[in-house]
Amino acid sequence: MLTTTLFRSIASCEINAWQDMYSAAGHELSDQFGIKVFSMGSACISLVKNIDILAFNRVIGLGLFQTATEEMVDNIISKYKNAGIKRFFIQIHPEAAPPQLKDWFAQRNIVHYNNWVKHYRGVENPPVVETELEIREVKSKDDVDRFGEIITLSFEWPDEMRLWFEHLVGRKCWKTYLALDGDRAVAAASMYVKDDCGWLSFASTLPDYRGKGAQTALIARRIQDAAELGCKVLTVETAEDNEEKRSQSLQNIQKMGFEVAFVRPNFLWKAE
């Protein structure tokens, strides 16, 4: 059951992971991409000026642990405007306060765009997945290069971003993985672990290997590793699965025992 304590744990874990992800970029990449991260109340505000990808230009945690104000909303908009960013997301948790948040958004032309679904599960009874693929942690220089390459290719993100993801390899609190078919790396994934919570992220598979079980094998490995690290709960987020747009990621994680924690709406601001 998703208790208040558990809800706060998985929400905090995600915020901590994203903050550390941006710190991992380092000064050179931060200057190259225009990366900045701010805290405002309980919100984590991330800006990547030179990469127009909503996943990296977004606000999470607004009104979650500290009640939001209209001034906060205005200040958030100002930060993105001043950085020259043309659009960004604000993601709202079900427990975000005050209830007037969505009214404040509407008054500022911040509109509902879509929903993402937050899932969770314990680490007990790790699933056993039969696969011919080799699942291993990223350690060698060749593996590091392939890890970043698979993520950027799979998500169709700019190639220069691969260095950013490669900086996660070996970083404190992070575990990074590859799935290989023989000598060919075909899928990648990561996990951020802090205290008793783990955040699964950057699940990516090359197009010609999708639907062949790489991600279920990577999920199983991360559940097993999380248990060994002393985690009690894991969390992951996917797009919604509906008739208009199917979500293979959502189907994969629910098959592996994850339950829905909550549906989180994404609100979009665009420069006029």
Predicted regions mapped to residue ranges:
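N-terminal charged segments
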Residues: 1-81, 165
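Conserved beta-hairpin
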Residues: 36-41, 100-111, 173-188
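A short helix-loop-beta-strand connector motif used in the catalytic cores of GNAT acetyltransferases and
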Residues: 27-38, 86, 113-115, 168-178, ...
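A conserved beta-strand-loop-helix scaffold within acyl/acetyltransferase catalytic domains
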Residues: 156-208
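Conserved acetyl-CoA binding element of GNAT-fold acetyltransferases
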Residues: 52-64, 196-207, 266
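Acyl-donor-binding surface of acyltransferase catalytic domains
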Residues: 67-134, 139, 236-237, 242, ...
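Conserved acetyl-CoA-binding loop-helix of GNAT-fold acetyltransferases
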Residues: 69-77, 202-205, 211-228, 251
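Short amphipathic alpha-helix that is part of the acyltransferase structural core
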Residues: 1-25, 116, 120, 125-161
